[in-house]
């Protein structure tokens, strides 16, 4: 899972 989703 990506950690830097805005």
From Swiss-Prot:
GO terms for molecular function: hormone activity. It comes from the Eukaryota. Keywords: Hormone. Has an oostatic activity. Inhibits trypsin biosynthesis in the midgut which indirectly reduces the vitellogenin concentration in the hemolymph resulting in inhibition of oocyte development. This is Trypsin-modulating oostatic factor. The lineage of its organism: Eukaryota, Metazoa, Ecdysozoa, Arthropoda, Hexapoda.
């Amino acid at each position: 899972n990506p950690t830097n989703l805005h």
